[in-house]
Amino acid sequence: MYPNSPSLGRIPLPLPCEQQQQASGYSDKLPVSAAPELLSPEQFIQASLNIQKHANLSRMLMNGNVLTVPPVSSPPWAYLNHSPLISPGSPSSSFQNRKRRSDEGNVSYDVKRQRFHSPQEQTVNHQAVPLRGDLRCSYPGSPAFPLLQSPSPPVLKEHVSNSGDCWLYDHIDTTLPVAEDKLSQQILDLFQALQQQVCDIKKKDICRAELQREIQQIFPQSRLYLVGSSLNGFGTRISDADLCLVLKEEPMNQHTEATQILGLLHKLFYTRLSYIERLQFIRAKVPIVKFRDKVSGAEFDLNVNNVVGIRNTFLLRTYAYLESRVRPLVLVIKKWANHHGINDASRGTLSSYTLVLMVLHYLQTLPEPILPSLQKKYPECFDLSMQLNLVHHAPRNIPPYLSKNETPLGDLLLGFLKYFAVEFDWSKDIISVREGKALPRSDDYLWRNKYICVEEPFDGTNTARAVYERQKFDMIRAEFLKAWGALRDDRDLYSLLPVTAIVKKMNSL
């Protein structure tokens, strides 16, 4: 468990909104639109001093100089187990200075997190009225803080069970479709073995909560969000966890501000957090800090203020639970692509995010669509001007989509493979989930001379920009063609994947 944590022996859970409001003090009286400016030079200096203060205190405690400790008010969860995790000459610390080939750009680590690339335009804050009390809670599984909180440490309340308090589970229909043929049943069986369990996300969120407590000692008004596949409904038991640290709602310069902040966090993690290992600071187009949590065993990637990742997490989450066939189909396709070596953006193939968008696009473009375009049907729920503290709440009341298309899972998998093997025009079309159809390519630099074009639903960038080599594109197309032929002939999932071995591995976790 985490040293000296107040959550020892229990899961940290959100406060009920009424109690949380009482604990938040003066902040409830402030207008939500007053976005805090946290990035002045004075605040960077103060953040560095905060780190130094806690580091000095830790060293004195470790050396036994208890009587010389200055009278610093320390929160009850201050960590006392401070062992450095990497040495200055270790691969982890020297990795950040490795030079990349000029033709490589930042593909290796940038495209892996391309879903977190923020739009260039600023988010508009039009919310002039304070939020209702029941809307001032954080995202699923997070300690519930108001957006503008007081500097005092958050108060956690012990709960016996979180199933009734956690937003993450209180409105989701997880009913699975009925399988009436062998292939569809195989897909369902594999999906049930692959899908992320409640215990998996709890472990990730415990670490997120601990990290947030530490980070708020440097940036008191910051918020740390779990995003990506861990939260969007398409995660597996072995999915990495993505974290987004939000300091302000406006876009942030990733080369200056975000890099500075991540440098401070890297120092904080290095000097104070003994439960973190394999710490790396990756200086890419979208810089991240990578690390592993010893307690849960989960791998984390932390970025700063790439808020589009929060928005698309909840867009994809809404699609995931809109129709019961979506999640099983997506998870099996992701597993197939990973098994055949075409699901790794750092190696010039497709990111998991791109694969999900491809599946959603296919389901939108059937003669009788299984999915609509949510951004066209419910534009107010996915408005880019919406404040971040409302993003998770807006789509909650979208009803399930009732499609007249009753195609079984097995036929949908076969149809997906056929669509991208022989029907989709890679050279002329752009995949657009936002529009719910394929768009003709323009002469814009984003699409010119690109092998695969998949539009990011919020910022309009190409999520498949990692595929920049003809050889990798040909390999991807060949895998689609080979899989379509094998499944068409055998109607057996074993022709695509070693299902038994995968299920056995998942069950052993």
Curated annotation (Swiss-Prot):
List where this protein forms a coiled coil: none
The superkingdom listed in its UniProt entry is Eukaryota
- One GO term of the cellular component aspect? cytoplasm
GO BP annotations of the record are:
mRNA 3'-end processing; negative regulation of miRNA catabolic process; oogenesis; RNA 3'-end processing
Keyword Transferase found? yes
List the EC numbers from the record.
Answer: 2.7.7.19
Class of enzymatic activity (EC top level): transferase
Q: Which UniProt keywords apply?
A: ATP-binding, Cytoplasm, Developmental protein, Differentiation, Magnesium, Manganese, Metal-binding, mRNA processing, Nucleotide-binding, Oogenesis, Transferase
From the UniProt record, which GO molecular function terms apply? ATP binding; metal ion binding; poly(A) RNA polymerase activity
Sorted alphabetically, which PANTHER family does this protein's record hold? Answer: POLY A POLYMERASE CID PAP -RELATED, POLY(A) RNA POLYMERASE GLD2
Subunit and interaction comment? Component of a complex at least composed of cpeb1, cpsf1, tent2/gld2, pabpc1/ePAB, parn and sympk. Following oocyte maturation, parn is expelled from the complex. Interacts with rbfox2 and sympk.
| Descriptive protein name | Poly(A) RNA polymerase GLD2-A
